[in-house]
Amino acid sequence: MDRRQFLATLAAAAASTALPSGWALASHSEDWTWLQGNWRVRHQRLKERLVGDTRWESFTGSSAVWLTLGGLGTIDDNVMALPSGPYRGLGVRAFDPVSSTWSIWWIDGRNPAHIEAPVRGGFEGDAGSFRGTDRIDGRPIDVWFRWHDIHGEEPWWEQAFSDDAGAHWEVNWRNWFRRTAAAPSPLPKLPDAPGDFDFLVGHWNVRHRRLRARLAGSDAWDTFNGTLHNWPVLGGFGNVGDNLMDVPGAPLRGMGIRAWNAAEQHWLSWWLDGREPTRIGAPLRGGFQAGVGRFFGEDQHDGRSIQTRVIWSRITPRSARWEQAASADGGRSWETNWVSDFERQA
């Protein structure tokens, strides 16, 4: 498909990216199986966007893609050999059964403190379509991602922007993917990457204890098992964990997403709850001292603002402990509400 054909297709399809109704939830766990693995990627990118530029630059890259959330999520770690130097970025995807759409977020390795607004959409046949909004040079734009030939030997992706509410679209990036391995493996780690979370990479069995009622004076706890699979991303400047928890009543899945903010010299830690897959929670911030990690952030509980604290401790090559606590008095007192003990799988 040439650029003119693509623009015509965008204009014709702009009214909707809805998926066919009645699809079983299980079928969507297969939506991204074609992308799982390691890839060699060929890029073409417009030098300047939305200024009428016709100059394109070509470069190569690599991608590693894992399925998460039982197939209803993915992580997509990328490195690109830009003309200006290596660039790393992380894509996070999650499926929402209520709207029957996928959300896709992007974390720029150069500015990991900011997660870009998601694009949303889905697949029909051999193609995928995802729409969203962004800003460029201070002005609002519409964004369109499209996947083509997803079951072919060389799936390809393209990005287009519009600054006139979708009346006209400019394609500014294309990627062609060639598989190098069916089973994904992490991309190479950078030599200057922080090693704080190296202990967490791999497969774990987890024993959880969770307080039944928070900040209510409760002493009743639920105990259940779970698993974690954690991967390094962003050249070691980030990591992502896929969690399954056998919570009484209904299993819980979620993704822990972490990135090192070099400018502020601390880690950011986000949580994507599989029960609310359209949003990524506000981050905790913190770091490690003397083998103990402490992270703090803000949250809401029963309509009131609270503070949250997470502590990583008891770290050995085969075990670790994670504890979460909440404070309703500005951090003067803390109530521990969740304790997870990790044991590395053989």
Feature roles, as predicted:
Residues 5-24:
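N-terminal export signals
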Residues 20-40:
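C-terminal segment of N-terminal export signals and the immediately downstream linker at the start
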Residues 23, 41-144, 207-301, 307-309:
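Central antiparallel beta-sheet cores of small beta-barrel/beta-sandwich binding domains
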Residues 28, 184-192:
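N-terminal pre-domain segments of enzymes
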Residues 69, 149-153, 234-235, 316-318:
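Residue-level recognition of beta-strand termini and adjacent short loop/turns
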Residues 151, 165-186, 317-319, 328-346:
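Extended, aromatic/histidine-rich regions of cofactor-dependent oxidoreductases associated
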Residues 160-163, 325-327:
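Conserved Ser/Thr-centered positions that define the repeating blades of beta-propeller domains
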